[in-house]
Amino acid sequence: MDPSPNTNEALTETRFSDLKPPLSEDIIEALLRSGPPGFEFCTPVQAATIPLLCSHKDVAVDAATGSGKTLAFVLPLVEILRRSTSYPPKPHQVMGVIISPTRELSTQIYNVAQPFVSTLPNVNSVLLVGGRDVRADMNTIEEEGCNVLIGTPGRLSDIMERMDILDYRNLEILILDEADRLLEMGFQNQVNSIISRLPKQRRTGLFSATQTEGVEELAKAGLRNPVRVEVRAESKSASLTNSKIPSGLHLEYLVCEADKKSSQLVDLLVRNKNKKLIVYFMTCASVDYWGLVLSKIPALKSISLIPIHGDKKQNARDKALASFTKASSGVLLCTDVAARGLDIPGIDYVVQYDPPQDPKMFNHRVGRTARLGKEGRSIVFLLPEEEDYVEFMRRRGVFCQEKKCSEEASDVIPIIRSLAMKDRAVYEKGKRAFVSFVHGYKEHECSYILRWQSLEIGKLAMGYGLLHVPSMSEVKQKRLSSEGFSPVEGVLKFEDIKFKDKSKEKQRKQNLQAKKEKLEDKKRERDKKNSKKAVNASSATADSKKRKLTGKQRQTIQTAEDEEEMARDYRLLKKLKKGSIEEDDFAKLTGADDF
């Protein structure tokens, strides 16, 4: 029988120790050791799901972001392995597989699972994600063995295909986390490949924040008579039918001109300097730029600013997330790479500096705060021409309250421009971020509301603190107006702006010199070709004129040319006698070397 929807409360009155079938004492002790006091009690999704999986039922779980889904499948996995007839397993006998869409989420699941998997003697779990050498993973598996695979679809399917040593015949449980995201990111083929290698006699748990046709099809193909678990968490300011938003979340929007956005952002960060915030930008280049610029603004010096996006190397992303997770306050600057699944504790505020390209990501972004029943706030910055986005979200069941611009916000544009004039890194990253934003804006799924043709490009460039509006086809072709941009007074030539990093500046100068020499070579080659063409044209013209002259006129011209040639040879002969030129040069110039 399907369990009925749970209440809005973050925690139920059900203790983990009261669940039936009962969890082992090792698990209960690990729960009390690894979590806050709340780990004594279950969240609704945990109370509903754990008994079902432990009773050998397949489940399709539709639950809110931040509802405690990870423990809802990690604990049953450990218990099922403990009770398996194949326990303890052989070193390369795989008994459990957990698939998630991103490296960060997989890493987080692995870290959550470790304290509980460690209660099983002779059971080893391994994390398999991209961004590192696959051969290193294979060597680890061969040497240490693995019984639980946790990772992303690409790396998991790759390892499965390469390693015949792995035995799946006694696999007990498969977990598909963030199933909707797995499909959205194009992992359908890899997921199917993984499932095809596993025995049909297994338990399967499918967890998803949204229900789509693709998820339903995946559930039909991968689950057997699943019990559907639906946990609702209605927000005070939002209610969705296709995606859940945490309770206790207060949603706001702020409308301001493009040239005021950065100042409003800095003001908001200063006012919340003792809190933990996530700020979302549209592009990787924007994260790079604002991560650099904001860290240099005096008012933000005391705030820890940590940028992360999909183009960063995996090690750098892992370190950044670990640093932010441990911190009690600070700001994570990111793209949507961190919008799903990451369980970062204690997020107080989510700021969407740019509306997401995919409107579904709005809910996943704001779901980083107000987790497990706590209070949280979220705000989305909108340009005046984007205000229809509020009504668009309202029709999707998301209700945001308007927040007025802070009249006390200091103008940070002069500071940013000053930074750009002193460091080419700021200057170039600013241009790159600006161009990437405009191009990204053109790809909006809500293009009928967020129209790139309506962007006030001049004000936007001011908001980025740029020294000039970058050269773009959209501006050149007059499709976007650069009105509202104020040139910097007394600015030096832009090509003279230097990198503060001496090695980068040295490389830049070398590149400039090489470019200059290349241009000069091209110019000489072009001049040579043009000169040759001119001589040929002149000769052809002269010949044509000669043919039109009388015999006497042609004879007169020829005599003059001969006299000029004799005079030139005489001048060269005098230079030869004085030693001004060598004999070889004289021979070449007079044509004597032809004889």
Predicted regions located by residue number:
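A short beta-strand element within the Helicase C-terminal
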Residues: 340-355, 377-380
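Intrinsically disordered, low-complexity, charged terminal tails and linkers of eukaryotic nucleolar
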Residues: 1-20, 25-26, 32-35, 84-93, ...
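Conserved helicase ATPase core of P-loop NTP-dependent helicases/translocases
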Residues: 135-140, 288-295, 301-339
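Short beta-strand and adjacent tight-turn residues that come in two discontinuous sequence segments
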Residues: 151, 334, 352
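Conserved segment of the helicase C-terminal RecA-like domain
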Residues: 366-410
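SF2 DExD/H RNA helicase N-terminal ATP-binding lobe
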Residues: 2-275, 282-285, 292-303
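Conserved AAA+ ATPase "SRH/arginine-finger" region at the nucleotide-binding site
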Residues: 228-238, 254-259, 353-356, 379-384, ...
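Switch/connector loops and helix/strand junctions flanking conserved nucleotide-binding motifs
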Residues: 106-108, 135-139, 157-158, 213-218, ...
